[in-house]
Design a protein with these regions (language model features):
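Rossmann-like dinucleotide-binding domain that binds NAD(P)(H)
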Residues: 1-38, 43-49, 55, 131
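Short, hydrophobic alpha-helical segments
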Residues: 3, 113-124, 141-148
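Short hydrophobic/aromatic-rich beta-strand segments that constitute the beta-sheet cores
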Residues: 11, 41, 65, 72-74, ...
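Short, well-ordered secondary-structure micro-motifs
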Residues: 21-22, 52, 67, 166
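C-terminal glycine/acidic-rich active-site capping loop/insertion
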Residues: 28, 33, 59-131, 153-196
């Protein structure tokens, strides 16, 4: 949803691959967009320390966010124009590199909650308005449905089909005993620092 909504996707969500849990702890999503673009999303709780990386490639360069730094590699003109006018099969292209480092400490979910509280108290505009949340949820639901059916799923998903598949999984769900008797909030928070 950061670059628009895909028209369809196919996904594999592996349940209990690394942990004794009833939900996915590894997921791969391949998405296709109306404009011909594609997207790949990979996530896993089994990789430690793991990698938090966002990479967006376009016809005029790419943006990479990793370890608190945004790196832009920019072309002077569209790569399609460069390749169309070059006699070389894979022409060398000059790029301009711009790096922008994160100046403030990461606030993650706490920052979103503080922003929400500030919007209520002071009437400020939300950093992440609720209307935007439906896009991420729609992609997640489509990924689940695709993983369950092993098929491509068109977006927006068919809500009835999704709910029927979800009910099937709820009916076969078994209650599990807690793995730990302690609060793991600190452990969880530290492990998932993304440094965007």
């Amino acid at each position: 949803w950061m670059v628009g909504m895909p028209k369809r996707l196919i996904a594999n969500c592996r349940i209990a691959h690394f942990h004794d849990i009833e939900v996915e702890d590894e997921a791969e999503i391949y998405a296709e967009y109306d404009n011909g673009a594609t997207g790949v999303f990979l996530t896993s709780t089994g990789e430690y320390p793991g990698t938090n990386r966002l990479e967006i490639s376009g016809t005029k360069g790419k943006a990479v966010i990793e370890d608190g730094t945004l790196t832009l590699q920019l072309l002077e003109q569209d790569i399609r124009e460069i390749t169309a006018s070059s006699s070389e099969c894979m022409p060398h292209c000059e790029t301009k590199t711009v790096k922008i480092s994160q100046k403030e400490p990461e606030s993650g979910h706490l920052g979103i909650l503080n922003d929400f509280s500030r919007a209520i108290r002071k009437g400020t505009k939300l950093l992440a308005p609720g209307e935007e949340g439906i896009f991420g949820l729609s992609i997640a639901n489509a990924a689940y449905l695709s993983s369950w059916t092993h098929e491509w799923v068109e977006l927006p998903t068919d809500g009835e089909v999704y709910r029927a598949e979800l009910r099937r999984r709820q009916q076969s769900s078994a209650e599990r005993k807690p793995v730990r008797g302690q609060n793991i909030t600190g452990e969880y928070s530290e492990r998932w620092r993304v440094k965007w």
